[in-house]
Regions:
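N-terminal mitochondrial targeting presequence
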Residues: 1-31
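CN hydrolase (nitrilase-like) catalytic-core segments centered on the catalytic cysteine
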Residues: 116-139, 206, 212-308
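Short beta-strand scaffold segments in enzyme catalytic cores
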Residues: 140-141, 155-158, 198-200, 288-290, ...
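N-terminal active-site segment of His-dependent metallophosphoesterases
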Residues: 30-81, 239
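A conserved C-terminal secondary-structure "cap"
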Residues: 317-345
């Protein structure tokens, strides 16, 4: 199944100025943020289904879908970047993470395809070769990572078009929830949280990476968005491989991605696994999608396996920032300590 447009029922109204060329009032025009440095690009999201207990089969299924995505769907437009979902090589269960975990020997100062291909990681080897074969950026969803200190992380490796492992994001915020009558899930029983923000430097501009539950924390996206924002070098998008469940998905999936997009005036990209139709394992929400800086979901799948194509358009970012110039209207003199925790007085 290939998709290019959002579902009709999810098309959202958009402010009239967004589609027209405005002559902004002098006071607003003088405050306009500098144009974002970047160029438009095409992205493909693989909403992967059929993940089971056989890791080799899971990897082969992902590889086949990457090869399919490269063909560009019905339009035949090859994507510049391909994204896989969260935990695509393993069942999504705390009891499985250590069993399926792999070492990821990543040194950003020595990024190379050989570093990935020669590692003992079956998943890294496949992803590196797939990126090289596709000649496209590849955000490798996420996989369980076994660190040298024996800790387990939920980690997202990113590969450049020549197959080099260029970034590794470890999920910062762990998914520990207990919703009465809904779902109880505690990643912290197995996983350790990461401790850094991950930003890619690409020919399209800066792109930040988060994983699933990271989306619920506006501070992470805000921190990523502020990097170079004042001189037009801020992030153009933030990508989240994610696996919301069928309790939180219908409540918050669309809401949170639209909020992060509007807050930071960049694109939000969400790539989910397809929803499992049998068994008693984890049921992902699905609905992989792309939201623009005005909060419009411009492309979205439903719950089944599929490949979604969308364009990340620099003109859309610049028009949003010119029309509602919050990037230059923030009052850091009032809330300079917005991310600090204060003790009760």
């Amino acid at each position: 199944m290939l998709a290019h447009l959002s579902r009709a029922t999810r098309k959202l109204p958009i402010a009239p100025f967004f589609h027209s060329h405005l002559s902004l009032p002098r006071t607003i025009a003088s405050m306009a943020a500098p144009p974002i440095e970047g160029k438009s690009f095409r992205i493909a999201l693989i909403q992967l289904g059929g993940v089971g207990p056989d890791k080799t089969a899971n990897l082969e299924r992902a590889r086949v879908k990457i090869s399919e995505a490269v063909k560009g769907g019905t339009e035949g437009r090859k994507p510049d970047m391909i994204v896989l979902p969260e935990i695509f090589n393993s069942p999504y269960a705390t009891g499985s993470f250590r069993q399926y975990a792999e070492r990821i020997p990543f040194d950003p100062s020595k990024a190379s395809s050989e570093q990935a291909e020669s590692s003992l990681s079956e998943s890294l080897s496949m992803l590196s070769q797939a990126a090289k074969d596709a000649n496209a950026w590849l955000v490798g969803g996420s996989i369980p990572e076994l660190a040298e200190d024996d800790k387990i992380y939920n980690s997202s490796p990113t590969f450049s078009p020549d197959g080099k492992l260029v970034a590794l994001h470890r999920k910062v915020h762990l998914f520990d929830i207990d919703i009465p009558g809904g779902i109880t899930f505690k990643e912290s029983e197995t996983l350790t949280g990461g401790d850094h923000v991950t930003i890619l430097e690409t020919e399209f501009g800066k792109i930040a990476i988060g994983i699933c539950y990271d989306l619920r924390f506006p501070e992470l996206a805000m921190h990523a968005a502020r990097q170079g924002e004042s001189n037009g070098r801020g992030c153009v998008a933030m990508i989240y491989p994610a696996a919301f469940n069928c309790t939180t998905g219908p409540l918050h999936w669309d809401l949170l991605q639209r909020a992060r997009a509007v807050d930071n005036q960049f694109y939000i990209v969400m790539c989910s696994p397809a929803r499992a139709t049998d068994g008693d394992g984890y049921k992902a929400w699905g609905y992989s999608g792309v939201t623009d800086p005005m909060g419009k979901i411009v492309a979205q799948l439903e719950e089944k396996e599929g490949i979604l194509f969308a364009d990340i358009d620099m003109d859309v970012i610049n028009k949003a920032r010119a029309g509602i110039p919050v990037t230059v209207q923030r009052r850091f003199d009032v809330y300079s300590d917005v991310t600090l925790r204060k003790q009760d007085s």
